[in-house]
């Protein structure tokens, strides 16, 4: 059975896209060290990212931008991204395994697996692709807006990030539907 593993990164941050990734692994090319991306060092994630994109049978990465997140809400934006991942790889898999407890509204043979990124290697691989891709976007945001410190906090609502929004203002990359950003917009 050919498995498509799907996971996302970036539901909690105040800025940047939510990213979903899907991976179909090549059973003949073993990638050692696959695990939940949150449990790996940045260096290990980068190394595994390169191995995954080189050796996977297929993969895709989808971004939903902050404006769409604001229009849909983060759950619907995440489900939309996951749906697009499956559509991008349609007819290449027998079953979809998604990290978490919710599935998009689709007709694919699928299962949501809580903590799937720690249990299923295809989901672990997707977790790594989504996290590294999103972190790279945050590094680009840091180059564009160095005063905000995106390389450090990756868009999460840290004290530093909130202080920098207050000091320098809300950017287009911020999610305006998120309460901390709304509060700062209304000050």
Curated annotation (Swiss-Prot):
Textual note on the cofactor: Manganese or magnesium. Binds 1 divalent metal ion per monomer in the absence of substrate. May bind a second metal ion after substrate binding.
PANTHER family: RIBONUCLEASE H2 SUBUNIT A, RIBONUCLEASE HII
Domain RNase H type-2 as annotated: residue spans: 1-187
Function: Endonuclease that specifically degrades the RNA of RNA-DNA hybrids.
Its EC number(s): 3.1.26.4
Full protein name: Ribonuclease HII
Binding site for a divalent metal cation: 7-8, 99
Keywords: Cytoplasm, Endonuclease, Hydrolase, Manganese, Metal-binding, Nuclease
The protein's required cofactors: Mn(2+); Mg(2+)
SUPFAM superfamilies in the cross-refs: Ribonuclease H-like
Record localization: Cytoplasm
Matching PROSITE patterns: RNASE_H_2 (PS51975)
The organism's taxonomic lineage, starting at the top: Bacteria, Pseudomonadati, Pseudomonadota, Gammaproteobacteria, Thiotrichales
Domain of life (superkingdom): Bacteria
Assigned protein family: Belongs to the RNase HII family.
GO biological process: DNA replication, removal of RNA primer; mismatch repair
GO MF assignments: manganese ion binding; RNA binding; RNA-DNA hybrid ribonuclease activity
GO cellular component: cytoplasm; ribonuclease H2 complex
